[in-house]
Amino acid sequence: MKVSYHGHSVVKIETNGKVILIDPFLTGNPKTDLKAEDVKVDAILLSHGHGDHVGDTVELAKKNNAVVVAPFELATFLSWQGVNTHPMHIGGSHEFDFGKVKFTQAFHGSSYIDEENKTITYTGMPAGILFTAEEKTLYHAGDTALFSDMKLIGELNNIDVAFLPIGDNFTMGPEDAVLAAKWVQAKTVVPMHYNTFPVIEQDPYQFVEKLQNCTGKVLEAGESITL
């Protein structure tokens, strides 16, 4: 399984001849190396409904006939826009032809904000994502605060790589993320959701230096690891 990072919370997985994107915020993302018009994708996994995570989902899904796997309310909202969706919910798992997906808790919000009409649409509970293929497991924490049940996620799953937000302000910051890394017990931890905007500026190298009992890896946009 090849896993690459593409800025903010964008993660690409290549496995079993399939390409999976998590939270494809490409257009308007100053930290990504990807352009929506160039992306080929078979499935899109969404952690929650905020614009910096849903991103280019509708365009990508329609262009590639890709399935969008998302929490129930968000999946329903996107299906109304003509997208092929597979709704799930927290604690549920499903075996797809590209791998197994399970949604975990995340402590955050989830909504679609229409600035023009000044409306906010609730899009369900936010989630973390466990993805398993080729006997390897990736944990994408989504946007979240530190929470004690991360210990349970670590106890129940043999996590090979975890992507954890470190930006602070909207999510946990580096200090909390160090504790999260300890709790989820991943072999490798990659920081995400930082330096996209001034309010979430952090030094990822300082973060990985503080990690214990795991390998910390800072991935620049386009860099990958193989599990």
Swiss-Prot record:
Signal peptide range equals none
Which InterPro entries does this one have?
A: Metallo-B-lactamas (IPR001279), RibonucZ/Hydroxyglut_hydro (IPR036866), UPF0173 (IPR022877), UPF0173_UPF0282_UlaG_hydrolase (IPR050114)
GO MF? hydrolase activity
Q: Which domain of life is it from?
A: Bacteria
Any Pfam family the entry gives: Lactamase_B_2
Q: Which HAMAP family match?
A: UPF0173
Which family is it part of? Belongs to the UPF0173 family.
Q: Could you identify this protein by its name?
A: UPF0173 metal-dependent hydrolase BA_4860/GBAA_4860/BAS4507
From which source organism is this entry?
Bacillus anthracis
